[in-house]
Amino acid sequence: MDIDQYMTDLGRRARHASRAMARASTAAKNAALDAVARAIERDAQVLKDANARDVARAREKGLDAAFVDRLTLSDKALNTMVEGLRQVASLADPIGEISNLKYRPSGIQVGQMRVPLGVIGIIYESRPNVTIDAAALCLKSGNATILRGGSEALESNTALAKLIGEGLEAAGLPQDAVQVVATADRAAVGKLITMTEYVDVIVPRGGKSLIERLINEARVPMIKHLDGICHVYVDDRADLAKALTVCDNAKTHRYGTCNTMETLLVSSGVAAKLLPPLGKLYRDKQVELRVDAAARTVLADAGVGPLVDATEEDWHTEYLAPVLAIKVVDGLDAAIEHINHYGSHHTDAIVTEDHDRAMRFLREVDSASVMVNASTRFADGFEFGLGAEIGISNDKLHARGPVGLEGLTSLKYVVLGHGEGRQ
């Protein structure tokens, strides 16, 4: 296969389809989503058979159990796909909305209309559910998409792509609006991320090595995040019961997510009261604690252990594991300085009852999501009321934070006149 020619053809067809998608009605888009949902219900066994072949090959390669679990399309996973499609269909369609319409002294009206981005390339690892999630969000937001999943899920993704194509056709929409890259050749990714004439944005969903490669090689703009080094700062004016709840949930609710707390900062004025019960809670949940000297003193005196001395590297680390770095700081200024220096601009939280300090934290912490008295785990499209998300961005341009339907659109200016000419 000539990868360069193959990817160019996908891009050309996607660009053509994107024009039809931009003018597609809400009814047609919702009909396509419903048709795909019904096709998955109808062909569940076909999908599971294709997926079983992917799973068998993954096991033959010796891939670990967690990887195989993410790859597997169980009945529950298929039901979740169907529910997700119908949920996206129920969301309000942002395309065509005109906002901020106002009269100018010249007599014209000026506003902004929400429009699709165009063609979105999505690169992800071996999670077949992303094929449906991404296709649904791109479809509802009026975009065409080129999906490049992990090679280990190729048969699963190909089977899903067939059903997506059927759904689009049934609704009178172009099948090329959603295309799955049907090759495991890594050169396909290299071509996709440089096709500026056909692809408007890349959304990568994967590990750090993938994101780093794309940062170095992509010519197409990206919506991405590299790390989730999330912090919780417990102020000396915190409610300790709230602090225990927030710190427990932020770390132990799920270890492997990008919005999990990786560093806990505790004000020196409250460390002696908070750290002993919190340390025992983490110990009971088998969380490894990597602590600075001040935190070690308090925790050791309370009989909490074992403890590991934190190094400079720990403040830079996204563990994605039951490991937590703890540092005692002098107060709010030191906490904000630490977060802005070591953080990844993803999600950070303060626990405090002081309104002025909370507002300072919200203003001065340079992150996509900043929280007061709430777990960092809430940094999620569903929890934010976006209905669904295609990913989380810690960049500052275009989309920032959880990226839902609106994040896959842009605004263009519209002018309504009555024959006016500029004086």
UniProtKB/Swiss-Prot annotation:
InterPro entries on file: Ald_DH/histidinol_DH, Ald_DH_C, Ald_DH_N, Aldehyde_DH_dom, G-glutamylP_reductase_CS, Glu-5-SA_DH, GPR_dom
GO function terms (MF aspect): glutamate-5-semialdehyde dehydrogenase activity; NADP binding
Pfam family, one: Aldedh
EC number: 1.2.1.41
SUPFAM superfamilies per the UniProt record, alphabetical: ALDH-like
Subcellular compartments: Cytoplasm
PROSITE patterns: PROA (PS01223)
GO biological process: L-proline biosynthetic process
Keyword terms, alphabetized: Amino-acid biosynthesis, Cytoplasm, NADP, Oxidoreductase, Proline biosynthesis
GO cellular component: cytoplasm
Reaction(s) the record says it catalyses: L-glutamate 5-semialdehyde + phosphate + NADP(+) = L-glutamyl 5-phosphate + NADPH + H(+)
Keyword Cytoplasm: yes
Recorded metabolic or biological pathway in which this protein acts: Amino-acid biosynthesis; L-proline biosynthesis; L-glutamate 5-semialdehyde from L-glutamate: step 2/2
Chief location of this protein within or outside the cell: cytoplasm
Family that this chain belongs to: Belongs to the gamma-glutamyl phosphate reductase family.
Record's function text: Catalyzes the NADPH-dependent reduction of L-glutamate 5-phosphate into L-glutamate 5-semialdehyde and phosphate. The product spontaneously undergoes cyclization to form 1-pyrroline-5-carboxylate.
Stored HAMAP family: ProA
Protein name: Gamma-glutamyl phosphate reductase
Organism (species): Burkholderia lata (strain ATCC 17760 / DSM 23089 / LMG 22485 / NCIMB 9086 / R18194 / 383)
